[in-house]
């Protein structure tokens, strides 16, 4: 909004259309915002390039500074799992068919599940940007050694490293039971599943079967939301323009394409053929580790310098994107 206000105030005309597109439901999955508008109003939104959230994150290491720009994002495979039991009186728990106890075991197995990592070019670029010691870098690129290698990373980097290299399962919502003295006959578990490129509903179901083992057939599974992973290439003018603009703030930095572990509205545009990047620009005080710590946490914020840098980045891109 700040950038567009400035563009309007200058009165300058550009060779193409520049569209400001704001919706309010990205955190709710984008279903009634970007998704429906991209689907039904594409004639109005049709765009070659898209810039959105979650990018321009500096990563400092002994090897220097890298700036992560989001070119891909993991997919959504959200599931609602329902575990059934038999109701009864809570004063007689021995031998009871308690749905909550079975649900607890489902959650435990999901937490303990270790899917095979998927290491691609984006992963290799991220590992290089970390500037780790040679031996640890080697382990980070070895699927057999990766689990132990991630455990050696600082806590603020380990979670993101794991999520960028694995399909993940996070049981986040549970519901069941009607009264303190009634054994529950049904418990639901909502699981945030984030998939890697190439994985669809069938692969999610295969993961769940592997994770739950003999409990799988006893659990009812419902798809809450499904969106495959998406990505944009970097062999284009927008990437070149972004890289040149980032270099004004971080002259020595390497601009690194990266995958975001959450979901953004970029996926809807990529599915229509647009090149979409997550690209702001954060200050040196909000590096990758600090950003990950704050995200959806108690202290979710950026500093004023990051806002200033992001505004300037987008103004530079608008000014320099057009072919001469």
Regions found by a protein language model. Give the residues of each.
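Alpha-helical metal-binding/catalytic segments enriched in His/Glu/Asp
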Residues: 1-30, 79-83, 94-114, 191, ...
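C-terminal substrate/ligand-recognition segments
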Residues: 178-214, 231-246, 267
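Short beta-alpha connecting loops at secondary-structure transitions
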Residues: 65-67, 88-91, 226-227, 293-305
């Amino acid at each position: 909004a700040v950038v567009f206000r400035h563009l309007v105030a200058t009165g300058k005309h550009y060779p193409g259309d520049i569209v400001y597109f704001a919706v309010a439901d990205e955190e709710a999955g984008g279903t009634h915002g970007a998704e429906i508008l991209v689907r039904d109003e594409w004639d109005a939104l049709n765009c070659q390039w898209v810039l959105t959230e979650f990018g321009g994150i500096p990563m400092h290491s002994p090897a220097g500074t890298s700036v992560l720009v989001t070119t891909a994002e993991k997919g959504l495979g959200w599931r609602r799992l329902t575990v059934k039991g038999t109701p009864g009186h809570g004063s007689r728990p021995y031998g009871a068919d308690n749905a909550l106890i079975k649900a607890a075991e489902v959650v435990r197995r999901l937490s303990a599940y270790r899917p095979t990592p998927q290491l691609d070019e984006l992963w290799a670029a991220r590992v290089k940007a970390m500037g780790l010691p040679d031996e640890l870098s080697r382990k980070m690129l070895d699927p057999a050694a990766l689990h132990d290698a991630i455990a050696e990373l600082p806590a603020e980097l380990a979670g993101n490293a794991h999520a960028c290299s694995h399909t993940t399962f996070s049981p986040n919502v549970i519901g069941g039971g009607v009264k303190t003295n009634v054994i529950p006959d049904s418990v639901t578990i909502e699981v945030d599943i984030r998939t890697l490129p190439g994985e669809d509903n069938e692969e999610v179901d295969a993961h769940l079967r592997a994770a739950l083992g003999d409990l799988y057939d006893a659990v009812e599974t419902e798809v809450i939301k499904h969106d495959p992973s998406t990505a944009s290439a970097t062999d284009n003018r927008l990437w070149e323009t972004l890289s040149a603009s980032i270099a004004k703030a971080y002259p020595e930095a390497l601009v690194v394409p990266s995958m975001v572990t959450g979901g953004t509205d970029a996926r809807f545009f990529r599915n229509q053929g647009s090149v979409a990047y997550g690209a702001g620009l954060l200050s040196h005080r909000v590096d990758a580790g600090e950003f990950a710590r704050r995200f959806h946490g108690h202290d979710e914020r950026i500093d004023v310098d990051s806002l200033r840098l992001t505004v300037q980045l987008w103004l530079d891109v608008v000014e320099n994107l057009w072919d001469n």
